[in-house]
Amino acid sequence: MVRRQSAPRLEFEAAAIYEYPEHLRPFLSEAPALPGVYIFHSESDTLPLYIGKSVNIRSRVLSHLRTPDEAAMLRQARRISWICTAGEMGALLLEARLIKEQQPLFNKRLRRNRQLCSLQLSEQKIEVVSARSVDFSHEPNLFGLFANRRAALQSLQNLADEQKLCYGLLGLEPVSRGRACFRFALKRCAGACCGQETPQAHFLRLQASLERLRVVCWPWKGAIALKESRPQMTQFHIINNWLWLGAVPSLDEAATLVRTPAGFDQDGYKILCKPLMSGQYEIIELHTDCRQS
């Protein structure tokens, strides 16, 4: 008996059904080879499909049009718009704000995290603190930014496992004074719970291990302006407590943006901390009237 073979199953990969989006070609010809943010729009003007950033808008948009994996988004796109910035920093900041505000269909969602937590070290103890009760922009000795309390505790547990720190002294499990914990018997704890290591030595090891996660306090008295320039365009990014308040073409207009932010902006911190602390940009501290001579 001849076994009947079934027809091979067709795999509709993106590359197999991709067609170059000719309807978007006119927008590509107008796209500038400059830094900024670009937006793919559907027929609806209220819900963008995708928001991205680049130091060269034209080049980046072209790469989207040639990518089969983005066929679904490209088929829905009806037009492309863009906003030019003075440089990469402005593009990063504007992209993050627009994604958070407009929630594009094909972007990873960015939302204000109301459960944001950190680990605070004080008086030889560590505890989880929430951004709802502590100002992360100014509170010292904070380590790590976590989506919630559970994530913070998991990170602390991972650190304890790596460094053979004592769960009991870290508050991760109950401890009986003077008695070795279960992990000590397994050689997973250095013995701070039973006198094999002093509490001070244990604390110093914990402190050293956490240092790479330190949250940097806002180092200025108030708002600052970060200057970013390219030929034919200069922007002053107004920033306070790690929050980007917006950009203006001159310092005389800074007063229209300066305010004290409510809460801590995790996305702003991640974008701004390293560049601001590295000294790679010109920073101007803003006075009360926000005018510079």
From Swiss-Prot:
One CC-aspect GO term: excinuclease repair complex
EC number assigned by the record: 3.1.25.-
InterPro entries: GIY-YIG_endonuc (IPR000305), GIY-YIG_endonuc_sf (IPR035901), GIY-YIG_UvrC_Cho (IPR047296), UvrABC_protein_C (IPR050066)
Transmembrane annotation, as ranges: none
Residue span(s) of domain GIY-YIG: 33-108
Top EC class for this record: hydrolase
Single GO molecular function: nuclease activity
Biological process per Gene Ontology, one example term: nucleotide-excision repair
SMART domains xref list: GIYc
The entry's keywords: DNA damage, DNA excision, DNA repair, Excision nuclease, Hydrolase, SOS response
PROSITE patterns noted in UniProt: GIY_YIG
Function: Incises the DNA at the 3' side of a lesion during nucleotide excision repair. Incises the DNA farther away from the lesion than UvrC. Not able to incise the 5' site of a lesion. When a lesion remains because UvrC is not able to induce the 3' incision, Cho incises the DNA. Then UvrC makes the 5' incision. The combined action of Cho and UvrC broadens the substrate range of nucleotide excision repair.
PANTHER family per the UniProt record, alphabetical: EXCINUCLEASE CHO, UVRC/OXIDOREDUCTASE
Protein name: Excinuclease cho
Species of origin: Salmonella typhi
Gene designation per UniProt: cho
